Amino acid sequence: MMEDNKQLALRIDGAVQSASQEVTNLRAELTATNRRLAELSGGGGGPGSGPGAATSASAAAVTVADSAVATMENHQHGAQVLLREEVVQLQEEVHLLRQMKEMLAKDLEESQGGKCSEVLSATELRVQLVQKEQELARAREALQAMKADRKRLKGEKTDLVSQMQQLYATLESREEQLRDFIRNYEQHRKESEDAVKALAKEKDLLEREKWELRRQAKEATDHAAALRSQLDLKDNRMKELEAELAMAKQSLATLTKDVPKRHSLAMPGETVLNGNQEWVVQADLPLTAAIRQSQQTLYHSHPPHPADRQAVRVSPCHSRQPSVISDASAAEGDRSSTPSDINSPRHRTHSLCNGDSPGPVQKSLHNPIVQSLEDLEDQKRKKKKEKMGFGSISRVFARGKQRKSLDPGLFDDSDSQCSPTRHSLSLSEGEEQMDRLQHVELVRTTPMSHWKAGTVQAWLEVVMAMPMYVKACAENVKSGKVLLSLSDEDLELGLGVCSSLHRRKLRLAIEDYRDAEAGRSLSKAADLDHHWVAKAWLNDIGLSQYSQAFQNHLVDGRMLNSLMKRDLEKHLNVSKKFHQVSILLGIELLYQVNFSREALQERRARCETQNTDPVVWTNQRVLKWVRDIDLKEYADNLTNSGVHGAVLVLEPTFNAEAMATALGIPSGKHILRRHLAEEMSTVFHPANSTGIRESERFGTPPGRASSITRAGKEDGSSNSKYRTGRLPLGKIGRGFSSKEPDYYDDYGSLENEDCGDDDLQGRPEQCRLEEYSSLEVTNV
């Protein structure tokens, strides 16, 4: 359209220029005509035809000019505005020509008499007139052509105006459509923003629900594991009760053989001793209705005798000859027993016969003795069939439902005086607890070489949180000296410690106590139990997802000081290289503060509100710092990432680029990355000198060394070797997925480190430690 308009304008300009040229030519012709007329008037023409011919010629010229002017005026009256000025000029020139004609006529009249000879002949004038007529005809044709061009230009102008109107209408419609599109786009954008906000709120709600469900699932898992451990303890207790019931069954069978003989021998004050070791059955304490019924069945033909109120002693060899002692001697023997005898077979049998530990067999004692023995055998066979491993939480609760029949209230009879029985049970449990606490107090104040068997068991159960090995320890370890002399093979075979990390924990603790006996105090790492490591410490370094693994393997402060990358990857399921480095740097920080929880907490408390001492910053403190530097939209990416102050300060390859990658800042946002680099340079670069001053203040040892420095045992029975330092941690600055080789360190104190860790099917029952996956035993 624009090209057509340009061409039309060029054509109009060309037509106007051609008209101007034709007008110029006409002016030149008129000028030439006037010049010739002047020459004719000056030459004097013929005598008869000169003045008349000149006058007629001038009149004809004037007429032609007038007609031409009139024609031009008629044709140019409706022309365009650009041609009007030319018409006015032509009119002025015509007026001038008329004046010149009048002047020439006057001159001719004055010079008619003397210039006749100079007048041109009529033939020449005719020729000139013909030429002028031809020129006027050409001028007329030119004017007609100009008029046709004007009409054509007018039509083209009309077409152009109509096209411009159509173009304007099209533009207006397009503008209206564009306004509608912009209006709809704004509306859709607002709707999409509202939808995005709603989705974000829904996402936050779902995230909170997800974490709540995870927390509930974790609590349910911990609860199930606790129930599982309790059920295992009850299993062990049931086995002990079954053994005691078997012994009681043999004793009852012995009593049933010679009833008349025992009745004749049961005189007041008479005492018969059989064997060296005896279990006490006091008759003056309340018996269950089933035992009384069985006694009535056995002695229905004999009258009541005062000896029934006395205590009967049955030797462990189950001889047929019973022994009877008085109430006073039995009570004196009970008073003389120490709290350490509570767990003895004598005390357990005494508690069983007094109704303190109800079992599933007591329900069958309501029938005669023979019937009860048959029921006992049937129940044993059923229990052997029902025994199976814990494969899932459903089995745990299924076994819990089966154990509901062990409620002591089901075995009580209306005549059995249940209140004294339960009271005696609570008293026995309280005595056991007091005895255990006394032994734990001895652990604190007595060297290990002076420990007795009970102290060793209390230390293993309470301090080391390993109750699963107490039974084997009670059978094989009778003193602290024996415990100090145990090798790794002895720990595995004698105590059933098949887990390499559990053996390492025991070995480190034993060597720590050995060093304490040599004149040094216990290491500060001994104060960090596995609960603090799994719950508090892992949460501080931002790796709480590994809490359950550390909890299951009972990783305490001493074990932290011995962990290497291989241990983290093989035993604790820490497969990510950066997480391994984060844990090792956290251990390095603990070493710098000499494993002192108080010093670490004091330094963290002082830098909670100001950006100082960043080496002790927790993962949560790093998140707070990221939010403070206006990067809160990326702060949540550091949750459970393992980024803490020790990584930012002690690892030189963890620079601003690695921090930006951990935060999830896109590589294209250079301004944000530069801002992060500047903030890190102002906070973390001066941290090295500050950390040195802090470590000097809190008394950090000058060099890194393990708390275990012995090369072997004093008796030479083990080839244990201990590392005194750590190898380099490796490069982590090039991102978190680098494939650099690991610098594994060997822990040489464990000769059989892989004792069945990968093959659980062939282990003995005491080695299957998955049953004790969650032990809630805290240090005293």
From Swiss-Prot:
<feature type="modified residue" description="Phosphoserine">
    <location>
        <position position="392"/>
    </location>
</feature>
<keyword id="KW-0677">Repeat</keyword>
<dbReference type="InterPro" id="IPR001660">
    <property type="entry name" value="SAM"/>
</dbReference>
<feature type="compositionally biased region" description="Polar residues">
    <location>
        <begin position="416"/>
        <end position="427"/>
    </location>
</feature>
<dbReference type="GO" id="GO:0005856">
    <property type="term" value="C:cytoskeleton"/>
</dbReference>
<keyword id="KW-0206">Cytoskeleton</keyword>
<feature type="domain" description="SAM 3">
    <location>
        <begin position="617"/>
        <end position="684"/>
    </location>
</feature>
<feature type="coiled-coil region">
    <location>
        <begin position="79"/>
        <end position="261"/>
    </location>
</feature>
<keyword id="KW-0175">Coiled coil</keyword>
<dbReference type="Pfam" id="PF07647">
    <property type="entry name" value="SAM_2"/>
</dbReference>
<dbReference type="GO" id="GO:0001533">
    <property type="term" value="C:cornified envelope"/>
</dbReference>
<dbReference type="InterPro" id="IPR037614">
    <property type="entry name" value="Kazrin"/>
</dbReference>
<comment type="similarity">
    <text>Belongs to the kazrin family.</text>
</comment>
<keyword id="KW-0539">Nucleus</keyword>
<protein>
    <recommendedName>
        <fullName>Kazrin</fullName>
    </recommendedName>
</protein>
<keyword id="KW-0963">Cytoplasm</keyword>
<comment type="function">
    <text>Component of the cornified envelope of keratinocytes. May be involved in the interplay between adherens junctions and desmosomes. The function in the nucleus is not known.</text>
</comment>
<keyword id="KW-0417">Keratinization</keyword>
<dbReference type="InterPro" id="IPR013761">
    <property type="entry name" value="SAM/pointed_sf"/>
</dbReference>
<feature type="modified residue" description="Phosphoserine">
    <location>
        <position position="357"/>
    </location>
</feature>
<dbReference type="InterPro" id="IPR037613">
    <property type="entry name" value="Kazrin_SAM_rpt_1"/>
</dbReference>
<dbReference type="InterPro" id="IPR037616">
    <property type="entry name" value="Kazrin_SAM_rpt_3"/>
</dbReference>
<dbReference type="GO" id="GO:0016607">
    <property type="term" value="C:nuclear speck"/>
</dbReference>
<feature type="region of interest" description="Disordered">
    <location>
        <begin position="692"/>
        <end position="780"/>
    </location>
</feature>
<feature type="region of interest" description="Disordered">
    <location>
        <begin position="295"/>
        <end position="430"/>
    </location>
</feature>
<dbReference type="Pfam" id="PF00536">
    <property type="entry name" value="SAM_1"/>
</dbReference>
<keyword id="KW-0965">Cell junction</keyword>
<feature type="domain" description="SAM 2">
    <location>
        <begin position="529"/>
        <end position="593"/>
    </location>
</feature>
<keyword id="KW-0597">Phosphoprotein</keyword>
<feature type="compositionally biased region" description="Basic and acidic residues">
    <location>
        <begin position="760"/>
        <end position="771"/>
    </location>
</feature>
<dbReference type="InterPro" id="IPR037615">
    <property type="entry name" value="Kazrin_SAM_rpt_2"/>
</dbReference>
<dbReference type="GO" id="GO:0005829">
    <property type="term" value="C:cytosol"/>
</dbReference>
<dbReference type="GO" id="GO:0030057">
    <property type="term" value="C:desmosome"/>
</dbReference>
<feature type="domain" description="SAM 1">
    <location>
        <begin position="451"/>
        <end position="516"/>
    </location>
</feature>
<feature type="modified residue" description="Phosphoserine">
    <location>
        <position position="372"/>
    </location>
</feature>
<dbReference type="GO" id="GO:0031424">
    <property type="term" value="P:keratinization"/>
</dbReference>
